[in-house]
């Protein structure tokens, strides 16, 4: 009986490890201050929570200086291991399930784009040096204004504090090979995802 119990325990442990290896969480982060963001942009833009307290004017100032706001990011986003910042890549194997968690106070999108570009908010595009919207993010209306593309498996919008299933690696939404992803609201939020075949080795 003791060995049976041990065997069951080992099987459960192996099952847990297998589960952990095939579920990857992509975290969206920001540090918006609810009072100042909601006063300028509109009610509900930033939801209160333990995500930070960057004032809207400071947020804009950082974008004017650096063309990014560092607290607004995907995790993983940046890799400084070689002494300079570069986009970190997320390695997955075909069949992996992704989960998208919004740990910030604003809504963010997780959108696959052919080429990194601007989003559907012209003001933020201009501040960050992204004058040309990624077509997967934005539609241009006859008057020149931008509206978001419809939500899809490769263009997911996640509200503040929410967690949603993301695309499955190897699916049409997240195909094998290299793909580029960005937030269509905050277009400096970017990441590269590489999906490998199940038995392919990678660095």
Predicted regions and their residues:
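Extracytoplasmic copper-binding redox domains, predominantly the cupredoxin/blue-copper superfamily
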Residues: 19-203
